[in-house]
Amino acid sequence: MQNWDTATNNNSNNNKSPALTMQQTAANSNNFLEHNTWYNQMFAANIKQEPGTINPHHQHPQQHSSMMASQPQHSPLTHSANHLENYLKQHAHNGGGAHHLQFSDNSGAMTPSPNTNVGGQDFGFESNTSSALNPSLQQHQLYQQHFQQAQQAAAQNQVSSHLPLGFNPLTPPGLPNAVLPAMNHYYSQQQQQQQQRQLQQTPSPSACLSDAHEKSSALTPRHTPPMDITPPKSPKTTVQAMDHQQHPEDQDLISNSSEDLKYIAESEDDESIRMPIYNSHGKMKNHKCKSCGMVAITKMAFWEHARTHMKPEKILQCPKCPFVTELKHHLEYHIRKHKNLKPFQCDKCSYSCVNKSMLNSHRKSHSSVYQYRCADCDYATKYCHSFKLHLRKYEHKPGMVLDEEGIPNPSVVIDVYGTRRGPKNKSAANAALKKACSDLKIPPTSQLSAALQGFPLQQQQQPQQPASPAKSSSSVASELPALTLNMSLQQNLAQQQQQQQQSPGAQSHSSQQQINNLLPPLASLLQQNRNMAFFPYWNLNLQMLAAQQQAAVLAQLSPRMREQLQQQQQNKQANENGEEDEEDNDEVDEDEEEFDGKSVDSAMDLSQGTPTKEEQQTPELAMNLKLSEEHGETPLFSSSAAARRKGRVLKLDQEKTAGHLQIASAPTSPQHHLHHNNEMPPTTSSPIHPSQVNGVAAGAADHSSADESMETGHHHHHHNPTTANTSASSTASSSGNSSNSSSTSTSSNSNSSSAGNSPNTTMYECKYCDIFFKDAVLYTIHMGYHSCDDVFKCNMCGEKCDGPVGLFVHMARNAHS
C-alpha cells in the first residue's frame, strides 16, 4: 500500500501545482491512518508491526473503540476495495481528465475491485458499498468457519498420529498405584474446548499447541508408582484392557503375579505368539529345541519346528492356536491357560498356576532354605535347574543337598548333564538289582533274621522271612522288640532243656551265651561278625546304632557279671595255649581271643576303622562253626588264605551255598555242619537248624557242644586229600570315608561223598572285587560296571572310583540309565 501511495504522489507532483499538492498530501495522510486502522484490525494478532508504522490503538484508543462499535465488521477484500475506491474518487475530482488518464494507466496493473466499473465513467462507490455490505459479511463468516474446521482437522490428525502413550512405560496400566482419568471426562473436556474455539473470531496457531498440551496432560497418570517397582514382562494391550472392564468377573480369576502374564490366553490372532517376547530387563526370550538345539525367537516358529521331530500320529494340537505336543498333560495345561483355569493356589499368597510343578517352584520363594549348594564355591540357590546351569558353566561339583526343612539329605543325587528335571534319588540305582534279586530262591530260614531275633531257632519252628538289608536302621530296630517278645517263651524253654543235657564244660559256655543274649540283637550280630557287609552306605548307620545299644547294656551290668566275663576270657586263653598240637586249632583260638578281647573290653570301637589285609586274611569267624552228628558234611570254610581262586567258575554243593549270598555285598550262608569221627559222644550235642550267618554263632546258635566243636572240628581236614578247594565270597564293609576294600576269601576241602548227594550249582566270581554270584544275571549286571581300561572306573558314567568299595558306593548312590 505504501508503494501505491508513493507512485501516486510522484505522478501527481509532476502535473499539479503546489496548492494541489498540499491538499493531496493532507488527503493521503487521512487515508494512510484509515488504512493502518484496518490493517491492524485484521492482522495485529498474527503479523508483527513494522518499526515505522503507527498503531492507532495506542494513539486513539477511545476513537478506535467507538469507531469499531459503530461500524460493522467487513471482510478483508471489502475493506481493501472500499479504500481504493475512495482514494481514486478523490483523485478524480481533484486531478481532472489528464490525471484520470494517468491513473487509469497505472491502475491497469492493479487488481480491480469487484464493485468498480473500470471502463465506465460513473463511479457509484457509496451505493455499491451499501448494497454489498450484507453479502460480504456472510462471506466473511463462511470463510472463517471453513478456516476453523480445517485447522481443527489438522490438529486432530497431528494428535492421532503422535498420540502419547497415556502411561509410564515402566509402570503400565494394571498396577495398583496407576490411576488414569476416565475416558468420558476426557471427551467432555475436548468438546468444551472445541466450542470455545468456535467462539473466537480469528484463529491463532497457539490454540493448537495449547490443545495438544492439554491432551497430553490429561492422559498422563496423576499418581505414578515409584520407579523401583519391577514392571511386568508384557503389558496388556488396550483391547484386552477394555475386555477386562466389560467382564470384571473374568478379571478376578486372573492372578496379579508377574509370572502369570506370560500365560495370557493366546489365540490365532494374538501377536504374542508371532512376535518376540522381551522380559523386564530388555532381553529377548529364546525357545530352544531339546532335540537338535535350534533356537527360535517366536512361539510360532518354535511350534512349526517342533512338528518336524514328532510322529504325525502322535501330534496333539491345540484347537485355539498352533501349539503342538506329544504329551497329553502338556496339552491339558495349555488349554487351561486358554480358559484361564488355575486350580493350584498358593496357601501363603494369591499366586495360582495350572500345574503342581509350578506351584512347588513358587513355594520355594516363601522359604529361606537354599537347598542346593556348590562344593567348589559359595553359590547357593533354591532351584535345581539354576544349580545345574551353574555346575555346567563352571564345571563345579555339587555339595550336600538339603531338604525343605534344611536337613542334609544324602539320598539325593544331582544329575548335572541329565535331561530329567529335578534331583534323583539314590534308591533308583538299585532298582535293577532288587528286581533281579527278587527272582532268587530264599532259603527256609534267614541267618540275618535268626541273628536279629537273638535266640536259636529249632527245626520245628515256622520259617521266618528274611529281613531286607536295604531297610533303614530305624526300621530294623523297630522290628527287634517284636521279634524278641514273640519268641521269648520258646527261648526260655529251649534253654532249660539244653542246660539239662549239657556237659559241665558246656555249662560255662552257656553262661557266656546268656551274657551275650543280654546285648541287643543288632549289636550282638555286628559285634560277632564285624565284616558282615550290608550296603556300604547303610552299614555305618547300623554300626553306630549297635554301638549305642551295646554301650547302654554294658553300663547296666553289675560288677559280678563283668568279673565273670573276664574269668571266662582267661579260661579260654588257657585252653587255647594248651592245644598247640594242631595248627588249625591254634589259629582258631587266637582269632577267638582277639575277637573276644575287642568285643568285651570295648563297646563296638569304631575308631579301629577297616581291617588291614593281614586281618582280612585270617579266618576270624571259623570258630563259630558247629558240629552235628546228624549231618555228615564238611565245613565250607577253613583257615587257608592262599586257596583263593580268581576268575574260575566253581562247582559247590547247593546245600553249602544256599543262602550264602544275597546281593553283591551282603553275604549270608546256611549252616554247614561238620561230620566228625566217633571221638565226640553222641549225647553231647543236639540238632541244630541250618540258619546261621557266616561266622555268627555266639548269639544265634545252639549252646550245646560249642567248646568240643572247636576242639574236634578240624581233625578231619586232612583225611581226604583229593577234595577240591573252594572259595567263598568276600565281605566288604565300609564306613564314612573309608575307601579300602575289606575282603576275605577262605577255602575248604569238600567231602566227595557229600558232594555227590546233592546237585551242583554254578558260582560266578568277580576277580576284581572278590565277590561270588549264584545268579548269572547279577553277575552280568555287576561286571557291566567294570570298565575295560580301568576296572575301578564306572563303565556307565566314566567316574573314577577308589577300589571296589568306592565302586560299590558309586553304584549305590548314583542312578545309571
Swiss-Prot record:
GO terms under cellular component: nucleus
Polar residues compositional bias, start-end: 103-119, 680-694
Top-level taxonomic group: Eukaryota
MF annotations from Gene Ontology: DNA binding; zinc ion binding
Pfam families, alphabetized: zf-C2H2
Subcellular location: Nucleus
Stretches annotated zinc finger (C2H2-type): 287-309, 316-338, 344-366, 372-396, 764-786, 792-816
Keywords: Developmental protein, DNA-binding, Gap protein, Metal-binding, Nucleus, Repeat, Zinc, Zinc-finger
Gene3D superfamilies recorded: Classic Zinc Finger
Acidic residues compositional bias, start-end: 577-595
GO biological process, one term: segmentation
PROSITE patterns membership: ZINC_FINGER_C2H2_1, ZINC_FINGER_C2H2_2
Ranges of biased composition (kind: Low complexity): 62-76, 189-201, 564-576, 721-758
Family annotation (InterPro entries): Mediator/Homeobox_domain (IPR052145), Znf_C2H2_sf (IPR036236), Znf_C2H2_type (IPR013087)
Disordered: region residues: 51-77, 93-132, 187-252, 456-477, 491-513, 564-619, 666-758
Family according to the record: Belongs to the hunchback C2H2-type zinc-finger protein family.
PANTHER family associated with the record: HOMEOBOX PROTEIN BARH-LIKE, MEDIATOR OF RNA POLYMERASE II TRANSCRIPTION SUBUNIT 29
Summary of the function given for this chain in its UniProt record: Gap class segmentation protein that controls development of head structures.
Protein name: Protein hunchback
Originating organism: Musca domestica (House fly)
